[in-house]
Regions:
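Short alpha-helical segments and helix-capping/turn motifs at coil-helix boundaries
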Residues: 1-2, 124
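Active-site histidine-anchored catalytic micro-motif
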Residues: 2-95
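Accessory alpha-helical/coil subdomains and C-terminal extensions
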Residues: 94-125
């Protein structure tokens, strides 16, 4: 990343999982995004894609310009998700400032066996 910065990188996109586990960090993706933000500064856009069942933390929301979730599980929409992330990066660069970031945590857990978007309850026609 330091090498890319020296060459004039103007945006950073990370394809993350959203539920990584690290021995010395309670919030692995939040830690990674924070470290990247510290390296690139506030003026370079930082966007990440995550699984639709990611554990999104306040820290992740605070340091990333946008977090983009896959809409399918299994993840067959990787290209579309990357395209949405690229559009957000482009918009952030055009605006020259960070947009509002919001999230709302729903009060339930869904079993992994029920998360497939190919079958009910997660599938919708």
């Amino acid at each position: 990343l330091a090498q890319a910065l020296a060459q004039g990188v103007n945006a950073v996109y990370l394809d993350l999982h959203g539920a990584a586990v690290a021995e010395h960090a309670d919030d692995a993706e939040g830690e990674l995004l924070s470290r990247v933000r510290a390296l690139i500064g506030e003026n370079i856009p930082l966007v990440a894609s995550l699984d639709l069942h990611a554990n999104v933390t306040r820290r992740m929301l605070d340091v990333a310009d946008a977090l983009v979730a896959y809409r399918t599980y299994p993840h067959v929409d990787m290209a579309e998700t990357g395209e949405r992330a690229a559009q957000l990066l482009k918009r952030r660069m055009q605006l020259g400032r960070r947009q509002a970031v919001a999230a709302h945590r729903l009060p339930y857990l869904i079993s992994l066996n029920a998360q497939s978007t190919w079958t009910p309850p997660a599938w919708t026609p």
